[in-house]
């Protein structure tokens, strides 16, 4: 009887261990904490409160992971520049609640009004909270291509926000930009002038960067990546992105770089995280095309060298497939 009890106990222990292992493997990389805490600061809807980047620039660094209910859609950087007379905000946030929380953080640092808001592109986390800022009298600025993106995908943005907030009645209103730009625009904040410009095709239509010469800083937006794998969309022109990079590096090589995701870094780091990855992926796809490889082969390209990047599991195979599909017709 005692021997049977021991055997039964061992068996139950093994089964419990297997069940626990299975449960662990069913968790997503986000749930396993592979991309950092699921929510870094539970005292605010922001994933993280703003930190000082340079003398005049602060940024609330968003989660380098897909959006979740817990991170409130704060998975990009929400940045602001303080002049002597006014403040420039970069990115409206995913929703009005994030925007309002960000505004409170700004008011805790300066009494100056937010005069301008620049959306780094037309993605939801860049424009979703613009409704709040417009109601504060802030001038909304975006690229003409970003405006087209919002018009085209607006319905999907509403649906995605409702899913992310898990509330069918969650208030979400998209608004138009007040000022549309193409190549560049200069903004006077009093005491300093910043340039909002496009370096060329990059990650998403309408991608713009903000150059702050006084602080030797480029708020690069989604032109540059490092800790997070660059997402490649159906409309992403990877060949154009590589050409754009040459211009970007030539002009901003000695400047501090604040990407759209992740903290500030230098040009060498974002080059490795962006340009080198694009070159690698295109070379791998070209080798497949030369051998009459298929889309299925593209999905299997070995990208394990980049497995340490956040969102690798979500994006690696998808990126390869999209590059393959695009290069078939180049």
Where in the sequence are the language-model features?
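Metallo-beta-lactamase
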Residues: 52, 86-88, 94-96, 147-199, 213-214, 244-245, ...
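Accessory terminal helices/loops
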Residues: 15-17, 22-40, 250-252, 264-330
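Conserved beta-strand hairpin/beta-sheet module of binuclear metal-dependent hydrolase folds
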Residues: 55-105, 210-212, 217-221
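Bacterial N-terminal signal peptides
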Residues: 7-17
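Active-site metal-binding motif and surrounding structural segment of the metallo-beta-lactamase
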Residues: 84-88, 96-141
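Acidic/histidine-rich helix-loop elements
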Residues: 60-76, 150-152, 227-238
């Amino acid at each position: 009887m005692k021997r049977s009890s021991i055997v039964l106990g061992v068996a139950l222990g093994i089964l419990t261990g297997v069940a626990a292992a299975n449960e662990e493997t069913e968790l997503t990389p986000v749930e396993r904490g592979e991309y950092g805490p699921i929510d870094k600061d539970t005292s605010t809807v922001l994933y993280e409160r703003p930190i000082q980047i340079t003398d005049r620039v602060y940024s609330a660094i968003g989660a380098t992971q897909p959006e979740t209910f817990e991170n409130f859609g704060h998975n990009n950087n929400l940045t602001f520049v303080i002049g002597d007379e006014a403040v420039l905000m970069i990115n409206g946030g995913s929703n009005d609640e994030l925007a309002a929380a960000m505004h409170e953080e700004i008011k805790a640092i300066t009494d100056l009004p937010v005069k301008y808001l620049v959306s780094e592109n037309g993605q939801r986390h860049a424009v979703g909270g613009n409704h709040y800022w417009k109601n504060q009298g802030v001038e909304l600025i975006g690229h003409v291509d970003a405006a087209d993106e919002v018009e085209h995908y607006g319905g999907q943005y509403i649906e995605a926000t409702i899913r992310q907030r898990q509330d069918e009645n969650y208030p979400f209103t998209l608004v138009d930009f007040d000022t549309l730009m193409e190549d560049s625009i200069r903004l006077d904040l009093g005491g300093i002038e910043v340039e909002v410009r496009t370096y060329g095709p990059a990650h998403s239509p309408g991608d713009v960067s903000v150059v702050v010469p006084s602080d030797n800083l480029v708020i690069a937006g989604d032109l540059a990546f490092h800790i997070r794998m660059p997402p490649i969309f159906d409309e992403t022109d990877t060949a154009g992105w590589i050409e754009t990079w040459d211009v970007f590096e030539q002009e901003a090589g000695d400047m501090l770089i604040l990407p759209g995701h992740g903290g500030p870094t230098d040009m060498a780091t974002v080059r490795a995280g962006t340009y080198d990855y694009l070159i690698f992926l295109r070379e791998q796809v070209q080798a497949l095309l030369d051998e009459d490889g298929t889309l299925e082969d593209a999905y299997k390209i070995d990208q394990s060298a980049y497995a340490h990047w956040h969102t690798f599991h979500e994006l690696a195979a998808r990126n390869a497939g999209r590059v393959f599909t695009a290069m078939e017709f180049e």
